Regions:
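Active-site-proximal alpha-helix that buttresses catalytic centers in soluble enzyme cores
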Residues: 22-115, 166-169
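Glycine-rich phosphate-binding loop signature in dinucleotide/nucleotide-binding domains
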Residues: 87-91, 179-186
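Acidic, low-complexity terminal tails and accessory targeting/binding regions
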Residues: 2-30, 39, 43, 126-138, ...
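Phosphate-handling substructures
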Residues: 39-68, 110-173, 218-226, 244-249, ...
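Active-site catalytic microenvironments for nucleophilic, acid-base chemistry
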Residues: 83, 109-113, 178, 182, ...
């Protein structure tokens, strides 16, 4: 009798993957750091306040990957590195950074001991397509129909020519799968971008699109991802030292602004099985 060539059902397939994940190697812990304040952050924030003047001249002639840190951004990165060296184990087994200049500058300014940073294209900023160099005024006027869809579709919305946050989550899946296999039982640090960190949160904390929309509409101080926000996911219980199968423990803090931090570790009831 010839074996069946039928595919297993979706439910059965997911169950098989979940069973496999219980024995799959995983990192013990990983840390995410958002880059410091950049030229683009300044231009965007001023535009939100009604001043669109920075969206002109040489600023529009460069791709956003070439935006540098501002003076304040460099101070934020240096302060974050100082805090990390004083309050965390900074002896990581692998160091990854987005290829964007603002992330690589931030990584260098952390001054982590023996760090050998690897630029990684999968950690690039979310692709904003035609929105990339558009002021708030242009977004309201030229992209009015897309703004309406953005409010309605939340994380499933993609700017014209760009990525939805749901698509960024798929990139994060690849990063996690690779690093879990390559650095099983080890500690890894990633310096990247705010949208990437939201994608990590969506995957690791497994909150729904509805919850994400609520958090974006009225974010609590500890839920924001500020410049140089530091988010840690760990399988090791910070109180008992016991090692869990999944990433069950999370901490989010902003070294240069304590008001944007949680008061300690949180246990995730729906830790990732990646």
């Amino acid at each position: 009798m010839r074996p069946s060539l039928r595919r297993p059902s979706a439910a059965r397939g997911f169950a098989y993957k979940a069973a496999q994940s219980l024995t799959r190697p995983r990192m013990e812990e990983f840390v995410l750091v958002r880059h410091g304040e950049s030229e683009g952050n300044i231009a965007f924030n001023r535009s939100v306040a009604g001043d669109h003047s920075l969206y002109s001249g040489a600023f529009l002639e460069r791709h956003s990957s070439f935006w540098r840190l501002s003076d304040r951004g460099r101070e934020q990165a240096a302060a974050t590195g100082e805090w990390m060296r004083a309050h965390m184990d900074v002896n990581f087994d692998a160091h990854f950074s987005s290829e964007y200049l603002r992330a690589m500058e931030t990584a260098a300014l952390l001054e982590l001991p023996s760090a050998r940073w690897r630029p990684e294209v999968m950690l690039r900023e979310r692709d904003w397509g035609e929105y990339d160099l558009a002021s708030q005024e242009e977004r309201r006027n030229a992209f009015e129909q897309y703004e309406a869809r953005r409010r309605r579709e939340s994380l499933f919305w993609a700017p014209p020519g760009g990525e939805s946050l749901a698509q960024v989550v798929q990139r994060i899946d690849n990063v996690l799968l690779y690093c879990n296999r390559r650095f099983g039982g080890q500690r890894v640090i990633f310096v990247c971008h705010g949208e990437l960190m939201w994608a990590f949160r969506l995957r690791l904390e497994r909150f729904s699109g509805l919850v994400y929309r609520e958090m974006q509409a009225d974010p609590r101080p500890g839920e924001r991802i500020n410049n140089c926000q530091v988010i840690t996911y760990s399988r090791r219980d910070p109180e008992t030292g016991a090692l869990e199968n999944d990433f069950r423990f999370m901490r989010s803090l902003c070294p240069w602004d304590p008001s944007a931090s949680y008061t300690g570790w949180r246990r995730l009831d729906r830790g990732s099985t990646l």
